[in-house]
A protein has these predicted regions:
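Short, structured active-site "lid" loops
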Residues: 61-86
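A conserved helix-loop-strand patch within extracytoplasmic ligand-binding domains
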Residues: 81, 87-143, 213
């Protein structure tokens, strides 16, 4: 059994301006279990920054969008990796959290792992959420069957328990939020270079209405600019690929240099590139050129 864990691992800088009058933010989320869980998760990191909030539930995305644009709610929390690079008119990213663990994980139920060849994973059917993850996993483990699904995390858990899948690729953050126990689950994290994460992975973002200046001013004080610097590179490349079949991860080292890994499915084949530069200027463009270059 999974005991959901609400402890915050996404954090905003604790530098709230004491002379700023705080208000209670209204957080809008969908009624489905994973969205509600993420809403509570969001409340945790807002509280860490001195901001009180309340959750309001909605039936579907259209109702949620209408509530945001009509000022019924102030923010809608999303995982940055799940956010399209072009937002609907009237919406904007108001704040990004600090970056949590970006790694992808192979997750198997213990009853599967105990019988499997964990070196090759031969014969296992593993669920993945998109084509680039399918291609990356198949390159690492040629003897598996990687199958694309559209299940939410809690649905993916159930699919592994009932045998629909032998395992799944999940984000490390998801395994933390769901407090997945080692006695029930085998979890193998991948290095971000060998299995490139999705653009924005490990970052929570708060979407606000563009004209809600009060909320945007409040959240500006907790927005993580260092994270924005690297995720902007990732999302620029993602946009160049029309938000499809692309994974991207940018990090800055202690010397101030940027290291950018990307993977894409081009003409049905996996292509990967890693670049290092002293600046982010032109980094996404160079990665695109390298990924599309014919050998």
């Amino acid at each position: 059994m999974i005991e959901t864990q609400y402890k915050n691992t996404h954090t905003f800088p604790s530098k709230m301006m004491h002379d700023t009058q705080l208000k209670t933010l209204r957080i809008g989320v969908l009624r489905e279990p994973w969205a509600k869980l993420f809403g509570v998760y969001t409340q945790g990191f807002l509280k860490d920054s001195g901001i009180d909030s309340q959750i309001i539930l909605y039936r579907d995305n259209q109702e949620l969008a209408n509530a945001l644009l009509s000022a019924e709610i102030n923010i809608c929390p999303k995982g940055l990796k799940d956010l399209p690079t072009t937002l609907p008119e009237g919406m904007t990213i108001a704040a990004l959290s600090a970056r949590d663990d970006v790694r992808q994980c192979l997750v198997l139920p213990r009853f599967v792992a105990e019988k499997a060849d964990l070196t090759t994973l031969k014969g296992l059917k593993i669920g993945v959420c998109n084509a680039v993850n399918q291609a990356q996993l198949s390159a690492l483990y040629p003897e598996i069957k990687a199958e694309i699904h559209d299940l939410l995390p809690l649905e993916g858990i159930e699919a592994m328990r009932n045998g629909q899948f032998d395992g799944s690729i999940m984000t490390t953050v998801t395994t933390k939020v769901l407090a997945m126990r080692e006695d029930e689950w085998f979890i193998r994290p991948f290095n971000a270079r060998e299995f490139v994460p999705e653009a924005g992975q490990g970052v929570a973002c708060l979407v606000a209405a563009t004209d809600d200046l009060a909320t945007r001013r409040l959240l500006k004080t907790v927005h993580n600019r260092d994270v924005a610097m690297v995720t902007n590179v990732e999302r620029t490349l993602k946009k160049m690929f029309n938000d499809r079949d692309i994974a991207a991860h940018c990090e800055r080292d202690k010397m101030g240099n940027y290291h950018f890994s990307a993977a894409a499915v081009v003409n049905g084949a996996l292509r990967k590139v890693r670049l290092s530069r002293s600046t982010t200027i032109g980094l996404a463009e160079s990665a695109k050129t390298a990924l599309l270059k014919e050998n």
